[in-house]
Amino acid sequence: MAQKKGGGSTRNGRDSESKRLGVKVFGGQAINAGGIIIRQRGTRVHAGDNVGVGKDHTLFALVDGHVQFAVKGPAKKQQVSVVPAA
């Protein structure tokens, strides 16, 4: 005879790793070319001047400069640009 009851099963015990999304460089801060500005799912924020878009919708700087956020158009879309360092 077993001296212990069988250990039951559980439906818990798994969790996905966080993806570290969000703004990495804020408005007014300096950034180098190639630096990541925002990691996002979909285009929550759109690319403006001197900003590139990666295949996972990551926004990155194409030139050295300062980050600038703006709200554009009638749909009030957020847009991020990089103002080149003079």
Swiss-Prot record:
Biased composition (Gly residues): 1-10
Molecular function as annotated in GO: structural constituent of ribosome
A GO biological-process term: translation
Region (Disordered): 1-21
Domain of life: Bacteria
GO cellular component term of the entry, any: cytosolic large ribosomal subunit
Pfam families membership: Ribosomal_L27
Keywords: Ribonucleoprotein, Ribosomal protein
Family stated for the protein in its record: Belongs to the bacterial ribosomal protein bL27 family.
NCBIfam families attached to this UniProt entry: L27
Record-linked PANTHER family: LARGE RIBOSOMAL SUBUNIT PROTEIN BL27M (PTHR15893:SF0), RIBOSOMAL PROTEIN L27 (PTHR15893)
Matching HAMAP family: Ribosomal_bL27 (MF_00539)
Protein name listed in UniProt: Large ribosomal subunit protein bL27
